[in-house]
């Protein structure tokens, strides 16, 4: 029993001694220097120099040679540098460490102005920075790595977006790739400075502002393809899109603008004069336009259904008159003529006449040609300089009037139009001048309201026929009469 207790006590003593030794090793020994010791160190260095550190350390009781050397180079010597390191010093430090290893005293001799402790601390800092940059570069390489599980799409602006094949369906990937422009599909957009990117998505394109000539005769089909905007969809094959874009200096745009100015000036002239002679002069202007257009070979750009523009001109005159005069005195009472022996019916007003179709196509075509020849013979030699409405330059530039210019000479004439006429293709033309009555719906009246309105307007019997020009609606009064 006594032996066992002795052994246990011996073990406890050994543990206590080991613990005390470890605690002493873990304790940091801080060396302090007093001002008196610093003065002694300076005096000994001035006498012995910086080579005999053992003699200098013997003058102190608790200072070693290493401590004396560090105190001198780190704090007391003014020749050593303090502060940041330059790139040249970092390069020299790395080269010296590669040659001498971790012998910092030798490295400090190479790197002038730095102590061995400063050299060691700087090298440790450089190693930490290098490890940090290598870790960041490794992360960037992993992120930019392309593998089968994580695919990236590179956009033209340099942005890459990962797409996972497992989580997305083929339809989703197709939709996300549909808006990415293909570099081979980037074409020049005419003569403009920007480019046009043709997307692979199926979009409805609007036809350009162009004139469609149906009965124009040309030597080859290239000119018709330039005038007609024909957009074709490509099904995996290379098919060129045929589009027409009018430039600012195009003769067609100039002709359209001159035609608008012509109609406006004619309407103002007729409204200002307010006589039958001014109306006849206006029709002579239109006839002269046709002659000029045929001479200049600009008629091939004309629109076949241009007769609606003549009605629009008369509607414009009527609207100007109704805005300046009183409503009761400005509107002319229509003369209704309905002969049972003929199939022609006309209802004339101050703004124009209603044109009805004739059952026989050959006779009406002959009548139209006779009317045109007589009007050309009568008005071919007359000029417009006396009226001062439009100049010769304007007459030469405008070539967009059809044969419907000589439909009427005054508001009471009626000219039939063939009921059946064959065209190569349907005409789809945006009207150049829309009437304000286009957006007004036709009213519905009862029998008593209809009779009251007829008596108020001075009309004995209602018009049994609606308007014969469905493409362009007549003014408000004719809409009201036709609805009754």
Curated annotation (Swiss-Prot):
It comes from Arabidopsis thaliana. Residues 1-20, 215-241, 321-383, 458-484 are annotated as: Disordered. Residues 354-380 have a biased composition (Polar residues). GO terms for molecular function: DNA-binding transcription factor activity; sequence-specific DNA binding. Keywords: Cell cycle, Developmental protein, DNA-binding, Nucleus, Repeat, Repressor, Stress response, Transcription, Transcription regulation. Transcription factor that binds to DNA in promoters cis-regulatory element 5'-GGCGCGC-3' of cell cycle genes, including cyclins, cyclin-dependent kinases (CDKs), and components of the pre-replication complex. Binds to DNA in promoters cis-regulatory element 5'-AGCCG-3' of auxin regulated genes (e.g. PIN3 and PIN7). Together with FAMA and MYB124, ensures that stomata contain just two guard cells (GCs) by enforcing a single symmetric precursor cell division before stomatal maturity. Residues 339-348 have a biased composition (Low complexity). Its main location: nucleus. Residues 53-76, 104-127 bind DNA. GO terms for cellular component: nucleus. Interacts with RBR1. This is Transcription factor MYB88. PROSITE patterns: HTH_MYB. CDD domains: SANT. Gene3D superfamilies: Homeodomain-like (1.10.10.60). Residues 463-476 have a biased composition (Pro residues). Residues 232-241 have a biased composition (Basic and acidic residues). Expressed at low levels in all organs including roots, leaves, hypocotyls stems, flowers, siliques and buds. GO terms for biological process: embryo sac development; guard cell differentiation; guard mother cell cytokinesis; guard mother cell differentiation; lateral root development; megasporogenesis; multicellular organismal-level water homeostasis; positive regulation of lateral root development. Residues 25-76, 77-131 form the HTH myb-type domain. Disruption phenotype: Double mutants flp-7 myb88 and flp-1 myb88 have strong defects in stomata repartition with large stomatal clusters formation. Increased accumulation of CDKB1-1 in the double mutant flp-1 myb88. Double mutants flp-1 myb88 have increased susceptibility to drought and high salt (NaCl), as well as increased rates of water loss; these phenotypes are associated with reduced accumulation of many typical abiotic stress gene transcripts. Lower stomatal closure in response to abscisic acid (ABA) treatment. Accumulation of CYCA2-3 in newly formed guard cells in flp-1 myb88 double mutant. The keyword Iron-sulfur does not apply. It is found in: Nucleus. A motif (Nuclear localization signal) lies at residues 13-20. Pfam families: Myb_DNA-bind_6.
């Amino acid at each position: 029993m006594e032996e066992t207790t002795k052994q246990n006590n011996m073990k406890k003593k050994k543990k206590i001694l080991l613990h005390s030794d470890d605690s002493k090793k873990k304790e940091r020994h801080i060396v302090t220097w007093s001002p008196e010791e610093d003065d002694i160190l300076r005096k000994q260095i001035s006498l012995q120099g910086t080579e005999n550190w053992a003699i200098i350390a013997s003058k102190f009781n608790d200072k070693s040679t290493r401590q004396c050397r560090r105190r001198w180079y780190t704090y007391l010597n003014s020749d050593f540098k303090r502060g940041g390191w330059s790139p040249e010093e970092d390069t020299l430090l790395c080269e010296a460490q590669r040659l001498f290893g971790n012998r910092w005293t030798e490295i400090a001799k190479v790197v002038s102005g730095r102590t061995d402790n400063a050299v060691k601390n700087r090298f440790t800092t450089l190693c930490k920075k290098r490890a940090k940059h290598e870790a960041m570069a490794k992360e960037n390489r992993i992120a930019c790595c392309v593998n089968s599980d994580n695919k990236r799409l590179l956009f033209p602006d340099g942005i890459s977006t990962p797409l996972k094949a497992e989580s997305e369906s083929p339809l989703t990937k197709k939709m996300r790739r549909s808006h990415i422009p293909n570099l081979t599909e980037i074409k020049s957009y005419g003569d403009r400075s920007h480019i046009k990117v043709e997307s692979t998505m199926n979009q409805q394109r609007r036809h350009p502002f162009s004139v469609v000539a149906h009965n124009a005769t040309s030597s080859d089909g290239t000119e018709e393809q330039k005038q007609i905007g024909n957009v074709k969809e490509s099904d995996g094959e290379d098919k060129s899109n045929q589009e027409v874009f009018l430039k600012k200096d195009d003769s067609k745009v100039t002709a359209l603008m001159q035609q608008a100015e012509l109609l406006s000036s004619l309407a103002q002239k007729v409204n200002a004069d307010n006589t039958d002679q001014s109306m006849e002069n206006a029709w002579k202007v239109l006839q002269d336009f046709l002659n000029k257009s045929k001479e200049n070979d600009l008629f091939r750009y004309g629109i076949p259904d241009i007769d609606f523009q003549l009605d629009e001109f008369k509607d414009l005159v009527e609207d100007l008159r109704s805005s300046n005069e009183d409503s009761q005195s400005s509107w002319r009472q229509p003369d209704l003529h309905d002969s049972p022996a003929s199939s022609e019916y006309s209802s004339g007003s101050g703004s124009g006449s209603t044109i009805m179709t004739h059952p026989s196509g050959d006779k009406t075509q002959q009548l139209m040609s006779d009317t045109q020849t007589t009007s050309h013979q009568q008005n071919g030699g007359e000029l417009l300089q006396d009226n001062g409405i439009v100049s010769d330059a304007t007459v030469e530039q405008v070539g967009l009037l059809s044969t419907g210019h000589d439909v009427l000479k005054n508001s009471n004439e009626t000219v039939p139009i063939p009921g059946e006429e064959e065209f190569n293709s349907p005409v789809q033309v945006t009207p150049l001048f829309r009437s304000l009555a286009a957006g007004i719906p036709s009213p519905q009246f009862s029998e008593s309201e209809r009779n009251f309105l007829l008596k108020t307007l001075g009309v004995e019997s209602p018009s049994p026929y609606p308007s014969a020009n469905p493409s362009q609606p007549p003014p408000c009064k004719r809409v009201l009469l036709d609805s009754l």
